[in-house]
Every structure is written in structure tokens, then in C-alpha cells.
Amino acid sequence: MDGSRPETCAECGFDARQWRVRDAATLFGALGFWWRLAIADVDLEILNRRPAPAVWSVLEYGRHSSAVTAVIRSALELMLAEDGRALGTPALSASAIEGNEVVLGHEAVLDALEREGQAMAALAGRQSAPWGNVGKLPDATIQAEAALLHAAHDVSHHFMDVGRGLAALGGGTPAAQGRVAQLNVSAGGVPKLDLGSDEAVIGWRGIEGDRQADHKHHGRPFQALCLWSTEVIAELAAAGHPIAAGCAGENVTLAGLEWASLRPGARLRVGTALVELSHPAVPCQKQTRWFADGDFARISYERNPAWVRWYGWVREQGRVRAGDAVIVQP
């Protein structure tokens, strides 16, 4: 974050030009929930173990993310209240140091992530806030919106680090292999239609040529792809529901994976692209017609965690076609 150009990151794919203030508000509002899903039932010893001496543990990353969120939120409060406000330099550790490991309790870390995430979401959700205001750091001038998006970059990048750390330590989603059963696109709305054997390009915003009709609730960077399971679809169809691949709006239909094992932070090599799961997709009324009784909420996380569709970030762009392998935790 230098205050003079849009922030980008080659490692995680972050590009501030692809983000809106409301995207950041949604991210921070869900931060604690995503973290809870990502580390649910993982042994505390694994959560406190560093994958390498100079790489933070999962819980150290969580503590850092809540601290960064709190510091940037405090600065934003000042900037939004007074344009040109002078800001101090925050004293935050930017990386792990070998030998300074800290053992943490997971509930305290999760509570802090939820508390700070909700506070930042409330700030970002303010109507007509002057996001063009600037703050003056000792060595740079930073716009309020850029500072907010820097915070979004920090927590999302470290959420990626958490997923990689859990995979390296054998926690979270286990390694597995499946395949791409179908790729689906539309000009907006459902159903999305089968691409057949055509190759698709997966960019930072998802499958090229696919569109969303509702940009208020869809199309955020952490919703670049929506993935679902042929096994779940087959189970629903066998129960009498008129549903098929693409009907529920997923643009990547996968086969051969233990769907209930997936969680936020899991990484999937889909064709040559690398996808990281972000959060369960919330079903909507447009999907009513695919269920015999109209009860589309049966595929919500709250009702049936093993039936949910998953949203994902694109961490590495690539190409894919139906039949390609899908490697979980490559």
C-alpha cells in the first residue's frame, strides 16, 4: 500500500480495481464465520503449529488479521471524519520471526476476528461516507477507500495462507482427486448451460463469458466461481426434484469428491487454474422451481452443510474443459 496506485498482488491475485467498498463490507461481515468453518474440528495443536519456523501458525495469522483490521478501522474513522488527517505509523508485525511462537486459544482468536470484522463491515456499510478523503502517513498520502481495500487484501491473503498451512499440516480438507463433470455459463440468471467439450478460460473474475444478473449479491472477487457436486445433484434428482447440473447457478460441476469434507481455504486445482474455496453459497428464490416442494433452502449451509454449493476465489488463472482432473490440496 503506497497510496499512489491501485494495490495488486501477483501471489493471491488481489486487484483493488476489481473491488468495491460494498465487497469489502461483505468480506469483513463474514470474516469470523468463514474462519470458524475453516478451522472447525481441527486439533488445537495443529492450529498452533507453524508449518515452517518463520511462517505463522493458523491462530497467529488470525490474531494478526484481527489486529490489522482494528488498526486500519481506527485510521479510517479519523480519515472519514476529517479529510487530510495526519496518521501515525502503526506498530504491527508484518511477518513471523523464528523463535517467537505464541500459543493461542482458538475461541479468543475467533471472537476477535468476528468482533473486528463486524466493526469494519459496519464502517464500510455507511451510506454516503466520504471514501475519497485522504489520510497523511509519515511517508505517503492514502485515500480512505484504498486503505479499506488494503485491509481486505491483508485478511484475504492471509486466509489463503491459512488454507495452505492447514494443508501442509494435514488439517482441514483432506487431499483428494475428482474431475470436472460439466462447465456452465449464461448471460445472467439460471439455469446456466453446458459448455460441452469446449475449453473455458478461468480468469480472476471467473469463467470468461459467464455473467451474473444480480450484481448486488453476486460477482464479488471471492465469488468468482460457484462449484457444486454431481453426487449431490443426483441425490436430489433421485428424491424427485427436477434439478440438473447448472440449474442452481454453479458454473463448475465436479464429480468424485467427498463434498462434505470441503471447507473455506481448501485449494482445488481445476484444470490448470487454482481455486480457493471462500464460503458456502446462499440459495435464493430463483432456484425454487428446481425443487418439487419449492424448498430451495434445503441446500443452505444451515440446513444441509453436505449439500451446499461453494464459492471460490481464483488464485491462479488457467484453462479447463469437462473431463479435466480436479486435485484437492495440490
Map each language-model feature to its residues.
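Well-ordered alpha/beta subsegment
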Residues: 309-330
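Short, charged, low-complexity loops and linkers
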Residues: 10-26, 100-102
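Cysteine-cluster motifs in flexible loop/terminal segments that predominantly coordinate metals
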Residues: 3-16, 288, 293-298
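A mid-sequence interfacial segment
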Residues: 88-123, 260-295
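Acidic/histidine-rich alpha-helical segments that form the ligand environment
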Residues: 27, 31-40, 75, 93-133, ...
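Short, contiguous alpha-helical
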Residues: 1-7, 13, 25, 44-94, ...
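A conserved acidic, glycine/proline-rich C-terminal tail/linker
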Residues: 288-314
